[in-house]
Each structure stands twice: as C-alpha cells, then as structure tokens.
Amino acid sequence: MRIVITGASGNVGTGVLRALAAEGGHEVVGLCRRPPDPVPPYDGVVWHRCDLADSRSRAVLDEVLPGADAVVHAVWAFQPLRDAGLLHRTNYAGTLGVFDAARRAGVPHVVHTSSIAVYGPAGEEPVDERWPATGVPGSVYGQGKAEVEAELRRFAAENPQMAVAVLRPTLVAQRDASESFRALFFDPLVPRWLIRLVERGALPVLPLPAGLRVRFVHADDVGDAVVRVLRTRASGAFNLAAGPTVTADDLATLVGARALPVPPSLVRAAVGALWRLRLLRASPGWFDVGMRSPVVDSTRALDELGWEPRVSGTDAAREQLRGLADGAEGGSPVLRRDRLRGMGGQRLS
C-alpha cells in the first residue's frame, strides 16, 4: 500500500512507522514540519515538509495525496495554549483540510488519531465507543478533539465512498517521547534532576491527586492498531488502552514510594496558579484531562481488529518514568530537547 502519514515524526507517528516497517512492503510518505534524519524508523520514508497551520499546506496535500491507498492523520498541536488561533488552524482547520484533500484525491481510506479525552465524564465502569463524545469539560484539548470528531462524522456520512476510522488511545507512552513530554508540559518548573530523584526512589512519599486513575498504551501498540485498521480497511471508532488501570498508589509503588493523597481541587488550583505565572506549560485543562477522562473498554479493537497490546499499562508507565528521568529523546526533531527549548509553540508533528 501507498500510505501517507501526517505528523509522521511525532509520538504516535513514530509508533506507526515502526509498525509499518516491521510489516514491510509499503510505500510510506511522511508529512511534517521538520523532516527527521534518515535513521530508523524514519529511513525509507519519503518526506515532505508541511505545516497544516500554513495555507500553503493545501498545495502540498494536493501534490502528495493522489494515488495514496490510505492517509493516517497524526497531527495535533498541544502548545502554545495561549495562542488559540494557532491551535485552531492546526487542529480543527488542519484536520478538516487533510480530510478534504483526501476526498479530492480519491483516497479510499482515512484514519484519524484522536484521544479518550473526546469523551464526556463517566463513572467508575469502563466506557465503550458509544459513550457521548462531548469532550472533557474545561479542556481545550478534549473540547477540540470532540469538535473535530463531530465534523469527521459529518464528513463520513457525506462521503460513503471513503472508509473513515478514528482511533481513541489513552495516554500514549514511549521512551523516545520522554524529553518532549517534559518540555511540552512540565518546563520550566519540573527539572529532570527532580524527576530522576523520584524515579530512583529517593522520595519516600509522593504527593499525588486523590482518585487519580490513568490508563497507558505504548506507541508501538498504537502503531500496531493502525496497521490492523489499514489492513482490514476498518471504519468507525476504536478505543485503545492497555490494562491495568494505573492508580496513584500504583505510580508511587513504581518508584518505591508511598502515595500521599492530595485533594484534586488543591492540585488544580496550584496548576492554574503556576500556569498563569508561566512556571508550568500544562494548564488546568490538562489536569482535567488526567483526572476526568474515563476508563475505556477496548473490546471492539480486540474483536474486530484482533488487537491486543503487547506492553501492559504498568510497563508503559515504567518506561515513560525511566525515560523522563534519563532525559530520553527520539531521533526526530520534534522528539529532541534541543529543538524544543526556547520555542514559542510545540506541535507533535
């Protein structure tokens, strides 16, 4: 297959490239703002420079997409949160631009990588793909995902000749994304040496929000799911999560500490104050994503795609923590700290 991947050098895109390379036999075209060096898994990919926030991206898409068997859309701007216009141009307008270009080019299959943040709040029980996709309240990220998915549902209904799939992963982890995560969300308040102390068990007590529940999924498992969707030309939404659910106690145990429950309202207030002071890049909305995104059920991916995560949620969390402590970075510019520092806005693409 000839497969075009937007955001191919980012966290999810890197996992997709690994999975496609492992399967072999594909012609892969990567679109991103800063093409990576020709090292695995980025070698063997035909790269085109493309910034979806730029009006010139339409010409690039119209040049590259004709003849593609599928498009995998893996671009999403997380930062700068203070520039709503840039986020809208990249995320909302950019996504719709990719889908419209795929329609013009006659691409039969389009895959959009979304998030469980698209769901509205739920109770304790896992939710499947039928849960209302209204977005995490108060989160620019969650609301943005919900708005885009609503448009894609309309797009799919108006273009029945195209198969449209949406993947909704939980927190996507991999060692190579560690330094970019820290730079995107924790700079400048949380230095690497502090994370290293935590990861090596130097702190006997770890303050964490009471009631925290997080499910991880490894980027390579997301890549595997994408390949399975492409192979079967699947459509519709698929939750992607690896068990078990990781609680505050579990996170503390991973670093040899005891969790100290902190009221979520206090943590959110602290995050808000630090964000307003520009001491933290993560806004209160990101805290809401972590606390209010529901636990999801991935049964549909298992039944229809045969997808089973090879990395457990606990092991994915452990890999991410160790990567954060080590300052691990990947081979693409967007996953390297030297390209993140001092930048006004970062996008995983």
Give the ranges of each region predicted by the language model.
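Rossmann-fold cofactor-recognition segment
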Residues: 42-55
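NAD(P)H-binding glycine-rich loop region in Rossmannoid oxidoreductase-like domains
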Residues: 52-93, 101
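Mid/C-terminal beta-alpha module of Rossmann-like enzyme folds, strongest
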Residues: 213, 221-282, 298, 319, ...
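Conserved Rossmann-fold NAD(P)-dependent oxidoreductase catalytic core, especially the SDR/UDP-sugar
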Residues: 93, 97-141
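Glycine-rich NAD(P)-binding loop of the Rossmann-fold in SDR/ketoreductase-type enzymes
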Residues: 86-97, 143-144, 217
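N-terminal Rossmann NAD(P)H-binding glycine-rich loop of SDR-like oxidoreductase domains
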Residues: 3-23
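NAD(P)-dependent short-chain dehydrogenase/reductase
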Residues: 162-213
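Active-site Tyr-X1-5-Lys
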Residues: 138-165
